[in-house]
């Protein structure tokens, strides 16, 4: 519903995609999280479920090989966006990393997170995420 509303309102929609290669298990992340996932050119690299149908409507899709996307943060810094909203998974890893990178490259853009459209690995993380985001000066929607 959120993506569809943004699309109907002619808002820019962007996605980041976790992107790994067949050598994933030899990377730093792969050594700490030894579960092959999001391997490029496999079904697991695609956007999941209903979200996948919106990829063709995206202004931009960023493949990222680490938790955050420097390319996304730089893209936002070159834009005229006054506000950006983040949502997705995994809240305490990829979403949080992208927020921090965006803050690093963009001192003026307002950053929002919709907690109803963001999920972490467990309930404890989800229950404490709001506090961390607010301390990072992120506007939190519930």
Question: Positions of the model-derived regions?
Answer:
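PIN/NYN-family metal-dependent endoribonuclease catalytic core
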Residues: 10-23
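Active-site-adjacent betaalpha module
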Residues: 4-12, 27-142
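Short amphipathic alpha-helical segment that frequently serves as the phosphate-/nucleotide-binding helix
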Residues: 1
């Amino acid at each position: 519903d959120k993506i569809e509303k943004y699309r109907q309102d002619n808002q820019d929609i962007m996605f980041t995609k976790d992107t790994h290669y067949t050598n994933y298990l030899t990377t730093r992340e792969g050594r700490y999280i030894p579960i092959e996932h999001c391997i490029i050119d496999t079904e697991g690299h695609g956007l999941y479920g209903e979200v996948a149908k919106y990829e063709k409507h995206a202004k931009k899709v960023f493949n990222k090989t680490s938790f955050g996307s420097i390319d996304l943060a730089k893209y936002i810094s070159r834009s005229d966006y006054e506000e950006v909203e983040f949502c997705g998974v995994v809240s305490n890893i990829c979403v949080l990393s992208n927020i921090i990178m965006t803050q690093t490259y963009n001192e003026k853009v307002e950053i929002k997170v919709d907690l109803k459209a963001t999920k972490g690995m467990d309930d404890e993380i989800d229950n404490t995420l709001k506090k961390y985001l607010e301390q990072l000066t992120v506007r939190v929607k519930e």
